[in-house]
Each structure stands twice: as structure tokens, then as C-alpha cells.
Design a protein with these regions (language model features):
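The feature marks the mature, well-folded catalytic cores of soluble enzymes
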Residues: 1-218
Length: 221
């Protein structure tokens, strides 16, 4: 990040926190989201962590959620994907999964939150089946939320099972106007339950891009 900032002439801000990019989501309008792991990694109380992050990141509200699994990577991008200021895709697992209760509590929390525009979030659920993974993963499931949005395309990791197509359909419904592409891993390292497409990529935003914001059109309004 320092080399990149130097290359394009940006100022460098030294954030006094351990900051894992895969465990932070923002709506772009002052609202942030992470799991409790973000606080734990910094060995701070939640209030201390929130004070620092809000001072440096200009956040109005920072929501901290329970870790989905004590033995997992615990990053929020393996649990959910904000695909717009008012739309989120949240994973769904089988009832016998150790993550089930936490994931459902997470989804219920979003049902109680309002967006930047003062309306409920539009929530889409995406079923993530169990997968065969590496020895280091506990109860792994397909990480369909660990996707990459790149300009007008959405790349969704594929696992070669019957639920791959359903995952693409969820994204198409949640993100009309985007080209949704199933992305098969063609390297020697397969997609894991906690290490997939979003974990292995880094987006670079265009500071000259025009930004237009408006309320999404909802039929019930």
C-alpha cells in the first residue's frame, strides 16, 4: 500500500490499528461493519477501538458482530457481501453447522438496521453448502460471499457443485445491470471456505470516477 501510494502521489496515513481488509465492509456513507475479531486482534476494549477507528476513518456508525466460529478465520467477507449502500448478500448454512446460530443472528441484526437513506436493508440469502477443503479448515462451506466486484462485473467463486448456479442467480437478482460471472480457480490452489476470490485480490479505485448516489427504486414505496 505504501509503494502504491507513493507511485500515484497520495499522502500516507499511519492507522494505529491492526487492520484486516477482509474483515471490514462499508456502505460508503459513514457506516462500517466487522466481526469481533477486528477488536480482539488489536487487544483493545471495543470502546477504545471504536474511538480510534471513528477518528481516523470518518465513520458515523461502526457495527461489530459476533465471530461466526471460534476456530475459523472469522472475517466478515466470508459471511456477507455488501453489494450496494442498501443491499447485502448474507450466507446461509445448514442447521447442523456450528455457524448456523451466529449466521442467523447476524442476518436478524441486519433486519433491524436502517440504511443511509433511513430504510431497511434489502437482504438476499445465499446458500453455502459444505465442501471438501484443506486440513486446516473446520466445517468449511462454499464461500460465495467472497466475491469480487470489478467495474460492471461480479466474479463469484465456483466450487463445482449443484449450488454454483444458484449462487450466480442470487447475485443477478441482487445486482441488476451487472454481469455476473462464475469464476473457476485455475491455479494449483483451490478456493477454500475461508480463502477464495475476495481474499486473494485487491481492488484499486479510480479517484477520477464520477460518483452518483440515489435511493434505489422500491416497488413498495
Amino acid at each position: 500500500n505504501i509503494d502504491f501510494a507513493n507511485h500515484i502521489g497520495w499522502d500516507i496515513l499511519d492507522l494505529p490499528l491492526f487492520w484486516t481488509g477482509g474483515n471490514f465492509m462499508t456502505d460508503g456513507y459513514g457506516m462500517g461493519f466487522s466481526t469481533e475479531l477486528m477488536v480482539n486482534e488489536n487487544n483493545l476494549s471495543q470502546s477504545e477501538f471504536l474511538n480510534i477507528s471513528q477518528d481516523y476513518l470518518n465513520l458515523d456508525t461502526y457495527h461489530i458482530f459476533d465471530n461466526p466460529n471460534e476456530l475459523s478465520i472469522q472475517h466478515i467477507d466470508c459471511m456477507a457481501k455488501l453489494v450496494g449502500p442498501e443491499t447485502i448478500i448474507i450466507k446461509q448454512v445448514s442447521e447442523n453447522s456450528p455457524e448456523y446460530e451466529c449466521i442467523e443472528n447476524f442476518a436478524e441484526s441486519f433486519e433491524e438496521l436502517n440504511t443511509f437513506y433511513g430504510r431497511p436493508f434489502e437482504i438476499h440469502r445465499i446458500y453455502c453448502p459444505s465442501i471438501v477443503s484443506s486440513w486446516w479448515e473446520i466445517n468449511p462451506v462454499a464461500a460465495y460471499t467472497n466475491s469480487l466486484i470489478l467495474n460492471n462485473k461480479v466474479l463469484v467463486p465456483q466450487y463445482g457443485n449443484l449450488y454454483d448456479q444458484s449462487a450466480l442467480e442470487v447475485y443477478s437478482q441482487a445486482m441488476p445491470g451487472y454481469e455476473v460471472i462464475g469464476f473457476d480457480n485455475n491455479t494449483n490452489e483451490p478456493w477454500y471456505g475461508e480463502d477464495a476470490l475476495h481474499c486473494r485480490t485487491m481492488g484499486i479505485f479510480d479517484p477520477e470516477m464520477i460518483h452518483i448516489s440515489h435511493k434505489s427504486i422500491r416497488t413498495e414505496e
